[in-house]
Amino acid sequence: MTHLPSFVDVHADVRNALETNAPVVALESTIITHGMPFPDNVEMAKAVEEEIRARGAIPATIAVLDGVLKIGLGADELEALAKVKDALKISRADIGYAISQGKSAGTTVAATMIVAQMAGIRVFATGGIGGVHKGVETSFDISADLTELGRTDVIVVAAGAKAILDVPKTLEVLETQGVSVVGYRTDTLPAFWTSGSDLDIPLRLDSAAEISEFQKVRDALRLGGGMLVANPIPAGDEIPAEIINGYIATAQAEMAAQSISGKAVTPFLLQRIFELSEGRSLRSNIALVKNNARLAADIAVALHS
């Protein structure tokens, strides 16, 4: 491991894995702080970590707790983070602020990628990436996740972009950023709660070993930047597009009526969709995160073989 700043605390299990060149999978924490209510959030986080351990890798949930940048959380720390009422949601722009001000915060995809690369963690599992929001023509609301994927060398396993986004424009920005977008056993881009879409995916690979080999060639070419592995939600857990799209449209109309913008957009939409779907969206969300964690662990193991 490289020397890390004094405000960074690496969990013993993660430190040992990195020092012995064992597979590690990074996990973000906005899904804990902003994605679902307590105690669902902590139960989900523990279950996802167990999925990774069961596949032979070490989980490293990344977060900021009271100004300390945590790479890997113990059970007590996970519970403490899950109970924080006013946690920040941090990206590249404000991760330093949260640490310097002694705040607690959930890390977005972008912030988690930054910390993972700093620690030498190659693979990261999340639910869905951020992207271009609908109505971008007037709001210019584009997630920093997309530019981070273009600049930071981490493999991100996700169920595509969150379906609340303008997914075609999100795919265009990823292409502009030079991000390798790989469909795992799929020819269309997964749409988060739905396993497929009408958008063709640029690249397809059918095994963790193939993804690992692709990354090794990218390393040899010194390309830099990230890879997005789009992993469809399991068929038994998906919500049909015609159903989920109705919930999304209702939630977005309410959001516009209430003039909600900025970082409040995604948490508001996810909460309203949870309410409109009577909890079904949350159950699907948990299932797809677990599915992504399993694939991420398999890729991490393959990279170290």
Swiss-Prot record:
Q: Which coenzyme or cofactor does it need? A: Mn(2+)
MF term (GO), any: hydrolase activity, acting on glycosyl bonds
Swiss-Prot/TrEMBL keywords: Glycosidase, Hydrolase, Lyase, Manganese, Metal-binding
Superkingdom of this entry's organism?
A: Bacteria
Keyword Transcription regulation found: no
Q: Where does Mn(2+) bind?
A: 141
Family of the protein in this entry: Belongs to the pseudouridine-5'-phosphate glycosidase family.
**Task performed by this protein:** Catalyzes the reversible cleavage of pseudouridine 5'-phosphate (PsiMP) to ribose 5-phosphate and uracil. Functions biologically in the cleavage direction, as part of a pseudouridine degradation pathway.
> What is the official name of this protein in its record?
Pseudouridine-5'-phosphate glycosidase
Q: Which gene encodes it?
A: psuG
